[in-house]
Design a protein with these regions (language model features):
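Interfacial loop-to-helix junctions that mark the boundaries of transmembrane helices
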Residues: 40-52, 107-114, 141-158, 228-232, ...
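Hydrophobic alpha-helical transmembrane segments of multi-pass integral membrane proteins
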Residues: 197-206, 210, 229-268, 272-273, ...
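Intrinsically disordered, low-complexity non-transmembrane regions of multi-pass membrane transporters
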Residues: 69-111, 355-360
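Short helix-coil transition sites and intra-membrane helix breaks within transmembrane domains
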Residues: 15-19, 174-176, 208-217, 248-261, ...
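Membrane-core helix-loop-helix motifs of multi-pass transport proteins
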Residues: 1-77, 283-285, 301-341, 347, ...
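Core transmembrane alpha-helical segments of multi-pass membrane transporters/permeases
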Residues: 147-217
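Hydrophobic core segments of alpha-helical transmembrane domains in multi-pass membrane transport
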Residues: 6-14, 49-67, 117-132, 157-170, ...
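Hydrophobic, small-residue-rich membrane helices and short re-entrant helix-turn-helix hairpins
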Residues: 98-114, 139-145, 171-193, 314-322
Length: 360
């Protein structure tokens, strides 16, 4: 359960920049264009807040585990009589299976990982050197590091770094022996991205029709007028939005797909009442992650149930839900309160990230 909760919370609170940051930033930029075509949301827009968030979530998960889940687990399972062989994910020594060898790393694979790890560290050192050394050709106007192309176009940087790392690993392990092997591996890697490419084709059409019909602007204007008339306190508005995201996430488990549906409405609407897109995006992430572990629609929910049944064969959806819910509620409430403290302190969510947008 700890691993399940941590992977859910870590989905939107990673210490390292990942594909989620790139996808959400791209969608937010497209949505902000309904109000300001020149507005651009950086993939690093939430990075300053996300790093301490990972620590806060780790502490919250630890607290829930120690104060509640451990006692609940002892009620469900007598740990003095657990069949370790049946519950483990490894096969006992006296049973041989053809898949065992596939789970073990060969000597050349271990060496490849070590060499690639060192290579990545070298690339990171070079990246930060080019970013911060005075006189670097990659610095932005007035030698501003945060306006460097290495920051604004970090998606390309990540792509190049992973391509180079994969190439090094392939050469060290000799899984790449000729130039013809590279396109083959690239094609194989793209297989996992095809569903995402199809999704974003549909999303791009949706956004284009939304802009063509002016429905996005109309919805944003009417929504902002309603919010202004209600004069709702900002913390309450934030809380209701987070709860809305969590509720929708019970049905749409793909973070990027859900944001693609919500962003064209909420981002322009919040901009018109003075809330920057980066703030709206972070609120979305707070509502999205914790809800992932309580929706049966998620494939990981079924996977977690299978793992749970190895220890407690009577476990069903209700059992997993009762164990997941304390984590989800605690993470959502604790993370949201941490965000409010950060927001009202005036600290930026990321490098060069505004907290407000000129209303109107």
């Amino acid at each position: 359960m700890v691993a399940f909760a941590a992977s859910s919370g870590g989905f939107n609170a990673s210490l390292l920049l990942n594909i989620t940051d790139l996808l959400l930033a791209g969608i937010s930029t497209s949505a902000a264009a309904f109000i300001d075509e020149s507005y651009k949301v950086s993939p690093l827009a939430n990075y300053f807040f996300v790093i301490p968030s990972a620590i806060v979530l780790a502490l919250l998960i630890t607290a829930v585990t120690e104060l509640f889940i451990n006692d609940k687990a002892r009620e469900l399972v007598n740990h003095d009589h657990v069949d370790d062989d049946a519950a483990s994910f490894t096969t006992p020594d006296h049973i041989e299976t053809p898949d065992d060898e596939g789970l073990k790393l060969a000597a050349e694979e271990i060496r490849g990982l070590k060499v690639t790890g060192l290579f990545i560290l070298g690339m990171l050192a070079a990246y930060f050197a080019l970013l911060f050394i005075p006189g670097s050709p990659f610095l932005g106007p007035d030698n501003a590091a945060m306006e460097s192309v290495l920051i604004t176009d970090i998606g390309a940087v990540i792509g190049v770094m992973f391509f180079a790392a994969g190439l090094v690993y392939g050469l060290v392990t000799r899984s790449i022996t000729s130039g013809g092997d590279v396109p083959r591996f690239m094609a194989k890697g793209l297989e996992t991205l095809v569903p995402m490419m199809v999704l974003f084709f549909a999303v791009s059409q949706f956004l284009a029709y939304f802009e063509w019909s002016n429905l996005g602007q109309w919805t944003a204007i009417k929504g902002s007028e309603a919010l202004t008339a209600i004069d709702m306190p900002t913390p309450l508005l934030f809380a209701l939005f987070v709860l809305l995201v969590a509720a929708i996430n019970l049905l749409i488990t793909s973070g990027s797909a859900q944001w693609a549906l919500m962003a064209p409405v909420v981002v322009p609407m919040f901009m018109l009442v003075g809330i920057a897109p980066e703030v709206t995006q972070m609120l979305y992430r707070i509502g999205d992650s914790p809800a992932n572990i309580v929706t049966p629609m998620s494939p990981y929910f079924a996977l977690a149930l299978m793992f749970l049944q190895k220890y407690y064969r009577k476990a069903g959806l209700g059992t997993l839900m009762s164990l997941s819910l304390p984590y989800a509620v605690t993470m959502m409430v604790g993370w949201f309160l941490f965000f409010l403290a950060w927001y009202y302190t005036g600290l930026p969510l990321g490098p060069g990230t505004p907290m407000e947008y000129p209303a109107g």
